[in-house]
């Protein structure tokens, strides 16, 4: 084999190149050391904006101290059978990915060979090696090592046998079963947990910047992991609200404020997650020029449908063939709509999204069971009624009003870390923009939520509502949606507290992986 691979022979040039990359990694590590610190313990780093921060590996988890291996090009060529076409797993703007087996350990791996003329250059290569060497989570792909022989740049990852989420959503062959509803919710919850780790556990937070269905890889049992961190950026620290950078990413997934201004925030990732979640619900691509005019862009197609819950069933993936819980569909679309708010400040935090999706993923759905047996199994989130005196939503489900939620949870607490305090703070945060004469219109200060919106939708078309329909301006509808964001945050926080109260301290570990 060495005869057909002349670059196998070691040379001073290759050795110098490898040393150069190692120096660049060390230099990049050192340069970030002076300004940032990546850690899982945020409390120890909040001593003031002038504190110097160091880039260190997280101290938690069994893999926290594992360093990336260095491989020779010979080793990786042998692992992939000289990069034969039958070993090719996929190809993108950054290069090709091959399946291989390491001769030394027998481990099955995925080898990404960067295209020297592609979109990912040496800087992105270094960023990915650095990020994945430091950040470890069950929902982030594991980096095994890298190769920097000569001008070759290769990354070695753990092998994900089920491919990418994109492979299971779009352009399915006739013999391939589509994902069922429960699996879709589980994948969404896992991907959100990976994003939550980057946003909330790393310090400073890491902005992924390239969240899309092709970058969510699936392992056994459809366990999702985020991959491809070449575009990741360290988030704002101190008093900064954003980081300014050139616009990168994939069309159809980029948040509008980032695409227009280059100002990147954690909420930019939340928007991208909303697009992926909408793909999971609808089965549509983020951008699909093969569809009819007006349906090319997934978000643009969905926005008017979000305003009328009677059209929600039309948004479900036809390949599901109606095998999904109606209430679960409504709640999933509500979460997607909140993530896709045009104003970044009104999008939920990824931690609240994790709470909502963890609940949705926990609701098992049997497509063969009678509809009544799938509706109210287990305890719902706090704003979902569990009593019989519920307002019907047409599918046997209903939502609590904010007052009923508060009465069931007891008197409001005043401590700043209590759920009630944070709930009021989140409501004020969303209402502040509407009451101050913002572009979404004025507001009365009433805490409207998802229950109010669904109640209005259920009454639409009645004689009493005919006269009011002319007053439902787009500005008011935007205000309603903003208030729905606040109520969703209330739901997430209250449900989390109920779980803690029911199972004891530390029992709600599903959001702390």
UniProtKB/Swiss-Prot annotation:
GO cellular component: plasma membrane
Disruption outcome: Impaired chitin-induced defense responses such as MAPK activation (e.g. MPK3/6) and callose deposition leading to reduced disease resistance against fungal (e.g. A.brassicicola) and bacterial (e.g. P.syringae pv. tomato DC3000 hrcC) infections.
Record PTM: Phosphorylated by CERK1 upon elicitation by chitin. Palmitoylation at Cys-4 and Cys-7 are required for plasma membrane location.
Domain of life: Eukaryota
Enzyme category, top tier: transferase
Membrane topology: Lipid-anchor
Catalysed reactions, semicolon-separated: L-seryl-[protein] + ATP = O-phospho-L-seryl-[protein] + ADP + H(+); L-threonyl-[protein] + ATP = O-phospho-L-threonyl-[protein] + ADP + H(+)
Keywords, in A-Z order: ATP-binding, Cell membrane, Kinase, Lipoprotein, Membrane, Nucleotide-binding, Palmitate, Phosphoprotein, Plant defense, Serine/threonine-protein kinase, Transferase
Alphabetized InterPro entries for the sequence: Kinase-like_dom_sf, Prot_kinase_dom, Protein_kinase_ATP_BS, Ser/Thr_kinase_AS
Pfam families, alphabetized: Pkinase
Function comment: Receptor-like cytoplasmic kinase involved in the transduction of signal between the host cell surface chitin receptor complex CERK1-LYK5 and the intracellular MAPKKK5-dependent mitogen-activated protein kinase (MAPK) cascade that leads to chitin-induced immunity. Phosphorylates and activates MAPKKK5 when phosphorylated by CERK1 after elicitation by chitin.
Family to which the UniProt record says this protein belongs: Belongs to the protein kinase superfamily. Ser/Thr protein kinase family.
Name of the protein this chain belongs to: Serine/threonine-protein kinase PBL27
Gene that this sequence comes from: PBL27
